A protein has these predicted regions:
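Phosphate-group recognition and catalysis centered on beta-loop-alpha active-site segments
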Residues: 1-213
């Protein structure tokens, strides 16, 4: 299974927007996207911790209510979507790998589980592994994955993969040919494939997270 990183992105569509997500679904692909929580506890699909890169405002998402973020983003015609809107668009038909970017409190994680409870295609992933372990403490059968960047030690990846409640691993493509990684009996997704040549080379035998193809 392959996932599109933050939705279809081209001259017409921008990353992490509902229009981009919808185009991905129309092509039959699931989504890998990032989420943050706003000051008023709304979950939004957005990559960065601040608005500086996208909206030229050096403001932290965690310190802003969603209404303020919506006001700023609307001026750029890039309305930041709520996670619940993405869930609705998916119609519970397409896989959604939801990457929790910051470390969430247990109360926020519980709220996240409640908001996504009817969407069985959702999988929670994070580089902040504390998020994943706390999700499992709240609900042990939650679909979750651990994310690893390069160069993480192979030994550490194997050790953490032994947890029976971890459903999958999200790995930098740096690890794609590693023999020890291949032996791990978990679903593995490799990120981020950015060209067609690479996609064609690895797509038949691996699960890929790709973009701009």
């Amino acid at each position: 299974m392959h996932l599109i990183h933050r939705g279809i992105v081209n001259k017409r569509y921008k990353e992490n927007l509902l229009e981009s997500f919808n185009q991905s679904f129309k092509k039959g692909y699931g989504i890998e996207t990032d989420i943050h929580a706003t000051k008023d506890g709304k979950f939004i699909c957005f990559h960065d911790f601040t608005l500086k890169k996208t909206f030229k405002k050096n403001l932290s998402i965690k310190n802003l209510n969603y209404s303020k973020i919506n006001e700023i983003s609307s001026k750029f015609n890039k309305t930041v979507p709520l996670l619940k809107d993405l869930l609705k668009c998916s119609k519970n038909r397409y896989p959604l790998f939801i990457e929790i970017k910051p470390t969430f409190s247990k109360s926020l994680l519980a709220k996240l589980l409640k908001e996504t409870s009817k969407f069985t295609k959702s999988v929670f992933i994070s580089f902040k592994h504390k998020n994943i372990y706390n999700l499992l403490k709240i609900k042990k059968n939650t679909k979750v994955g651990l994310s690893f960047s390069a160069p993480t030690s192979i030994k550490n990846i194997i050790k953490k993969s032994n947890c029976k409640n971890i459903n999958c691993l999200i790995l930098d493509k740096y690890f794609i040919n590693n023999k020890r990684i291949k032996k791990i009996k978990k679903n593995k997704y490799f990120y981020t494939v950015k060209n067609k040549k690479e996609f064609m080379k690895y797509s038949k035998k691996n699960n890929l997270i790709f973009e701009n193809l």
